[in-house]
């Protein structure tokens, strides 16, 4: 038995499942073909991340609405990166009445948060990234309805190897606890 963990984008997970180069994927929500099946592992809140000395940081200790970020420059993933969170954050911003001005783009979360710490803008990411302790930034819960991000386990409907099936059962059983 051999398990290989590889970090790839949500788009790459979907493509790998389709072309059968991977058997099981873990990803953020993204439009998927009918040949794939999804099990939601968890759903977590989104957080706005900004410099600790940002004016909104002190005003928003109990959370922040997306509309408060309308005039802020955003640091985010490139549209072409294939991250499932991209469309969700843009949708939340549009629902709040604005289109984010993305002034800096990076493909890695550590870089995005580092650029925020350098004062180049704000970002919105899943709350699990709070674990990345970077000096000079604060994390504020986004209060808008629907400001959560799911993590999916995804696989092909039509076939599963015994190992993929065992892995899926292990993950889903542990999540159900």
Short names for language-model regions:
Residues 1-34, 105-106:
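Central regulatory/effector-binding core of bacterial HTH transcription factors
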Residues 17-27, 46, 98, 116-122:
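Alpha-to-beta junction loops
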Residues 29-30, 52, 79, 127-128, ...:
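Short secondary-structure boundary segments
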Residues 34-40, 44-45, 59, 110-157:
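Beta-alpha-beta core module
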């Amino acid at each position: 038995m051999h398990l290989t963990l590889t970090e790839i984008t949500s788009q790459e997970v979907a493509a790998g499942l389709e072309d059968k180069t991977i058997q099981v994927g873990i990803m953020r929500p993204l439009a998927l073909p009918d040949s794939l099946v999804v099990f939601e592992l968890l759903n977590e809140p989104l957080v706005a991340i900004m410099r600790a000395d940002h004016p909104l940081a002190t005003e928003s200790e109990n959370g922040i609405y997306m509309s408060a970020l309308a005039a802020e420059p955003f640091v985010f993933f490139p549209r072409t990166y294939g991250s499932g969170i991209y469309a969700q954050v843009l949708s939340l911003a549009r629902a709040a009445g604005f289109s984010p001005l993305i002034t800096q783009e990076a493909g890695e979360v550590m870089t995005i948060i580092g650029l925020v710490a350098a004062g180049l803008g704000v970002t919105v990411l899943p709350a699990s990234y709070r674990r990345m302790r970077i000096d000079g930034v604060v994390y504020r819960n986004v209060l808008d309805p629907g400001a959560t991000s799911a993590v999916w386990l995804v696989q092909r409907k039509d076939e599963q190897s015994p190992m993929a099936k065992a892995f899926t059962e292990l993950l889903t059983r542990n999540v159900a606890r």
